[in-house]
Curated annotation (Swiss-Prot):
Family: Belongs to the UPF0761 family.
GO cellular component annotations of the record: plasma membrane
Keywords, alphabetical: Cell inner membrane, Cell membrane, Membrane, Transmembrane, Transmembrane helix
Transmembrane listed as a keyword: yes
Keyword Transmembrane in record: yes
Regions crossing the membrane: 47-67, 104-124, 143-163, 189-209, 218-238, 248-268, 292-312
UniProt cross-references to Pfam families, sorted A to Z: Virul_fac_BrkB
Topology of the protein relative to the lipid bilayer: Multi-pass membrane protein
Lineage, uppermost ranks: Bacteria, Pseudomonadati, Pseudomonadota, Gammaproteobacteria, Cellvibrionales
Localisation: Cell inner membrane
Stated name of the protein: UPF0761 membrane protein TERTU_3006
Organism: Teredinibacter turnerae (strain ATCC 39867 / T7901)
Length: 428
């Protein structure tokens, strides 16, 4: 029994340590990626894009006879849950604006669509920044994603609304027969599950990189839970505060801005959570090696795949044991320096002849040996640190030796690796 207790204490201590370290990394990444500033920027963009998005939604509903009138009902339902205390006033304002927008000319409609597109583009850029992706979607893939959000999104939301309405009607009809309150529980769980699914799709589909669905789903559930908690707390504060006493009818404006900012903060926090979770899950001993070793391991894989006429996916590199975020950072670097190229399917192929590329080029790309920027500091540091000049000389010698040692081509390096493996194979 005592041994069991000790084992449990050790395990709980280890779990607490992991959770503490994870929380520290989560808050660090949230601040490092400037998520709070991004939330403020997206709040500002939302003010301009919300009416265009609603206009597109109404247009989609009007084009489908089965959903006739659903737009207004859906609008009321969303804002009832969206902002408990001021949702009715905000909903009325936005509905009026959207009704006026539907009477715009062709040029006005184009401007509304451009505004909605820019918001979606800004959201993708923010998510790419969180995942360390520098290259946004371009061409057909980006257009299809945004069009899917603007066209299919409202239909899915309408389907969710109809499902919720159906469950509510079933709950009312079976109220006397449902002694255990099962339908009431289902009616409460389904909207939360749909919210979780929406966040999951947002985390998985928006970034221009492969996000494991498992971690996206976990992040979606956690984010939906945080959303419900913050919504309840916000509603309680609004209901028991003196905002309306101070601002009067104008109180809806600061409250709406505050809520939108909180909403984007929760969403971006969820995206950072998914990224941090994925990095922790894929982390291994190899991911703690230097950038240069990781690049060489990846280039060796690209060489093998190129010999077979195949491309390399994100999953292929992650399976090597490299951290997901570490790989994405090195991938962006290799694409930027044209070591690899992106295919139309989103995979990657080798774009350089490894017989004409040497190890030193890789070392220079990842800034592995020494930094030439230190030489520019000679005058500033030498006066305060007499040893700095001697250090620069030794550093220069190290660089020359490293450059000479790394002059071998990458093809020779990888070919030598296979030659060393052959005797071992013959012996077996």
């Amino acid at each position: 029994m005592q041994k069991l207790v000790k084992t449990w204490l050790k395990r709980s201590k280890r779990i607490r340590g992991v959770l503490l370290q994870f929380s520290k990394e989560l808050f660090f990444e949230f601040n490092e990626r400037g998520c709070q500033r991004s939330a403020a920027a997206l709040t500002y963009m939302t003010l301009f894009a919300l009416v265009p998005l609603m206009t597109v939604t109404y247009t989609m509903f009007s084009a489908i006879p089965a959903f006739d009138g659903v737009g207004d009902q859906l609008n009321g339902l969303i804002f009832h849950h969206f902002l408990p205390e001021t949702g009715e006033e905000v909903s009325q304002y936005l509905s009026d604006f959207s009704s006026q927008a539907r009477r715009l000319s062709g040029v006005g409609v184009v401007m509304l669509l451009v505004t909605a597109y820019l918001m979606l583009r800004n959201i993708e850029t923010t998510f790419n920044s969180i995942w360390g992706v520098k290259q946004a979607r371009s061409g057909l893939s980006g257009y299809l994603l945004y069009w899917a959000i603007l066209s299919v999104g409202p239909i899915l939301v309408a389907a969710a609304f109809l499902l919720s309405t159906y469950l509510l009607s079933v709950q009312i009809m079976l109220e006397d027969l449902d002694g255990l309150g099962v339908m009431q529980l289902v009616y409460r769980v389904v909207p939360w599950a749909l919210t979780s699914a929406a966040f999951t799709l947002l985390f998985v589909a928006v970034p221009n990189c492969r996000v494991p669905f498992k971690f996206g789903a976990i992040g979606g559930v956690i984010t939906a839970f945080a959303f419900e908690v913050v919504k309840a707390v916000f509603g309680y504060i609004v209901a028991n505060s003196s905002f309306k006493l101070i601002y009067g009818a104008f109180a809806v404006v600061p409250l709406f801005l505050l809520w939108v900012n909180l909403l984007w903060t929760i969403i971006l926090g969820g995206a950072v959570f998914v990224r941090t979770l994925a990095e922790h899950s894929y982390a291994s001993r190899i991911s703690r090696l230097s950038d240069m070793i990781v690049v060489l391991i990846c280039l060796a894989l690209f060489r093998e795949k190129a010999a077979l006429g195949e491309s390399v996916s994100d999953r292929d590199c992650v399976r090597l044991g490299i951290g997901l975020v570490h790989w994405q950072r090195m991938r962006s670097l290799m694409v930027e320096h044209r070591w690899i190229a992106v295919t139309e399917s989103g995979d990657y192929v080798l774009s350089r002849d490894l017989r004409r590329a040497n190890i030193w080029e890789v070392a220079s790309m990842v800034r592995m040996p020494v930094s030439e920027e230190l030489s520019s500091l000679r005058e500033n540091i030498a006066g305060r640190a007499p040893w700095f000049a001697d250090f620069l000389e030794r550093q220069s010698e190290l660089r020359s030796h490293a450059e000479s040692a790394f002059s071998v081509s990458l093809e020779s390096l990888f070919a030598a690796e296979h030659e060393e493996e052959k005797p071992l194979t013959d012996q077996t």
